[in-house]
Amino acid sequence: FLHFQTSAMGEGALAINFVLDELTALLLTDKRGFFSAHEFSSSINLIMGETIQDIAQGRTDSVAESIQRTITNRPSVWDRALGASLAALEPNDDPRRSLSVLALKSEAIARVILDGLGREKTGALLSALVNQYRGRHFHAADLYQIAADHDIELEPLVGDWLHDSSLPGFLVSSVESVRLTDDSQGNPRYQTRLHVRNDESTPGLVRFSFQWGSKKKRIWDATEPIRVPANSSVEVGISTLTPLGELWLKPYLSLNRHDVKLRVPKVDSEARLNTEILVGARPSDWKPRKTADIVVDDLDSGFSVRSEREGEAISIEISIGSPFSDEVADMDQGLPEYKSIYGTAEAWSRSVYEDSWGKYRHTHALVTSGAGDQHAAFSTELPHEGRWRLSYYLALSPEQKAKKGEEAEGAATGRLTASVLGEYQMNLISNGDNQKIEFDGKAAASGWNDLGEFQLPAGEISLEVSNANTGFIVIADAIRWRPSTLGK
């Protein structure tokens, strides 16, 4: 529609056209506009497998949307998106991945503009662009001038989206939910509040989706888009007639990469507070509390893996007989990406898991139990000598009674319960000393698990985890060092 009437030229022209085409498609049809034959050039089995899984699990009812998500929302695409600006992206270098980066970013930027401006202002912007440049080309500066002429501020929404490869990153406080006094008509009022911080130097947009209602009638709603300036926080308030059942942070294009499910507390419906209600967002000075803890996550530079198998490079061995046995796993920040449809992970791989530890992304490393020839290490520097308490993080779902053999199935399908774990082989290495640590994964709790207190010198220290384990899989998510004088 728009592309056949006017087109960008000059620096960033391809990216501008991508964004405007996506914006036009979303405005007119509420659907994405991008399609490329490169989407089917490889990994067709994986694409169709994930599409079937998406539809079966209710994540979407659109085959095209699922295919686009599978192709563009891959670790290697994100890595390239973070490594170069859209203006500097050269499609002739690896066309398939370049087009995927353009699709990933342009769709997100288009949604930011549409949701941030609203349909009326977005339509006015596109209409003015076509009317002024029909049959001619325009430059990026012309687009921004048209926006300024119509009192439309693009910079606070998307920053320098053409030249800057940096993204916002969102942190969220704990969620507070209370029942307020009923309104003047006797209707119940429930208030949910939380703080959101953009801890990066690029502005960003978020919204929250939430579920409320009765057991017989669940209702999904969403907040309006909320602007969060760079290195700033806002407080968000939601009002409903019932307590929330679910609450999700939905960033657009951010270092979080995925939607984040938030923990919703239980509400005491008998206690009713007479206090001011907040609906929407307002500036906040909230920041995560600083502690003396030293945490090493699987995405940190202090995490590494090694193999004792002769000549083996980092790779994933997909189960024999799997329909994906000919697929090449994508790489996720140095480790093969793991998906439950692959089967078992014979080498350390990285899995996205909503309850795992992480600042922006929530992931863990995992490997199938084996002969002790695969190792993961969490390394850091202790700032001073003394007694330190060590904890090991595991994100575990509640146990459900399983039939014989279902534990192994759970390990392969991504259901993380203590039943798939076993006795870990761990070694604490410091100042040339090697100390074995006992840890029974079957007895582990979800969250931080205490591994003991140790008298240690200042300097480098490493906790090494082996794949020799009595369970089905080994999980390496995060460790925490805490000075013992601060207690547990």
Feature locations, PLM:
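Amphipathic alpha-helical substructures
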Residues: 88-175
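Terminal connector regions
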Residues: 242-277
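Beta-strand-rich binding/interaction modules
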Residues: 181-252
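Extracytoplasmic
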Residues: 277-488
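Solvent-exposed strand-loop boundary residues in beta-sheet-rich modules
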Residues: 212-216, 253-255, 430-432, 485-487
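Long, well-structured alpha-helical subdomains associated
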Residues: 63-107
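A terminal-accessory region detector
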Residues: 144-205, 210, 451
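Zinc-dependent metallopeptidase catalytic helix centered on the HExxH motif
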Residues: 1-82
